[in-house]
């Protein structure tokens, strides 16, 4: 640690997280040097609250930086649903870009509390109705029954999750999740589909999306790359990962899709 601090004198705090730690505290992280870590960061002029000890990760995903930029550039005046929101950074970026309404959905209200802090940092107006701490499956069903629809839906689920309400499985059940949210998207709206499963190849993922596009009501609009400074591999397109991400440049595979509705004659 001493050598690290000499080489990188700007370091104020070091946290060690043990993936296979025997306690939850070890997995979420223990401060081994310095004071309390920073609780906010800024990206593209927007503030994001963070809590480095909240979970096993850093509470903020750098790999979706290009997607936050896309949200800021494309969602002005739009109504947005951020499913599996975690700490809500995609929704925060949408609001920073001028979205008129963002619904942040995650079954863990503790994660959504970080999103609320981000709203405060940016002086965004907030309402209890902007945050929905419910399981994805019943929450989406309720939105359908009450006639809610959106210009853009972010679908960024965990690799695997199972509750008594339903199963999320990015390796075998991603199409089901997409079909679950499609009815909520307005004509010419966007469905942003993210699959970060390292065991799902880029070609397999893309093929599954192309199969969903066969009816003509869904189309692939854009593939967003992960920032090069995040890829973490000497040659991210070489197939050295568990599954080759090509044509994506990382196992975090981001696709912007356009949605069409059947128009009443």
Indicate where each model-derived feature is located:
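S-adenosylmethionine
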Residues: 135-214
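Conserved class I S-adenosyl-L-methionine
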Residues: 77-86
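S-adenosyl-L-methionine
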Residues: 108-154
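Conserved SAM-binding loop of SAM-dependent methyltransferases across substrates and taxa
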Residues: 87-100
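Conserved alpha-helix/loop element of class I SAM-dependent methyltransferases that forms part
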Residues: 62-78
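Non-catalytic substrate-recognition/targeting regions of SAM-dependent transferases
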Residues: 1-61, 69
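Conserved SAM-binding motif I beta-strand of class I
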Residues: 101-106
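C-terminal catalytic and target-recognition region of SAM-dependent MTase-like enzymes
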Residues: 190-265
């Amino acid at each position: 640690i001493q050598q690290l601090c000499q080489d990188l004198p700007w370091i104020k705090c070091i946290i060690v997280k043990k993936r296979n730690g025997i306690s939850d505290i070890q997995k979420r992280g223990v401060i081994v040097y310095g004071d309390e870590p920073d609780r906010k960061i800024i990206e593209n002029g927007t503030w994001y609250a963070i809590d480095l000890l909240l979970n096993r990760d850093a509470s903020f995903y750098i790999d979706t930086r290009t997607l936050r930029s896309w949200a800021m550039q494309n969602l002005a005046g739009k109504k947005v649903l951020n499913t599996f929101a975690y700490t809500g950074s995609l929704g925060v970026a949408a609001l920073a870009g001028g979205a008129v309404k963002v619904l942040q959905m995650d079954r863990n209200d503790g994660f959504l509390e970080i999103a609320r802090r981000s709203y405060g940092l940016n002086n965004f107006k907030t309402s209890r109705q902007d945050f929905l701490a419910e399981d994805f499956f019943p929450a989406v069903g309720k939105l359908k029954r009450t006639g809610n629809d959106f210009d853009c839906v972010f679908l960024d689920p965990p690799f695997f999750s199972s509750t008594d309400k339903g199963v999320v499985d990015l390796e075998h059940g991603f199409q089901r999740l997409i079909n679950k949210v499609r009815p909520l998207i307005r004509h010419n709206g966007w469905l942003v589909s993210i699959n970060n499963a390292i065991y799902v190849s880029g070609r397999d993922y893309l093929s599954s999306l192309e199969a969903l596009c066969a009816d003509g009501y869904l189309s692939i609009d854009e593939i967003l790359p992960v920032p090069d400074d995040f890829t973490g591999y000497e040659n991210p397109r070489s197939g050295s990962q568990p599954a080759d991400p090509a044509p994506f440049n990382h196992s975090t595979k981001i696709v912007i899709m356009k949605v069409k509705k059947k128009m009443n004659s």
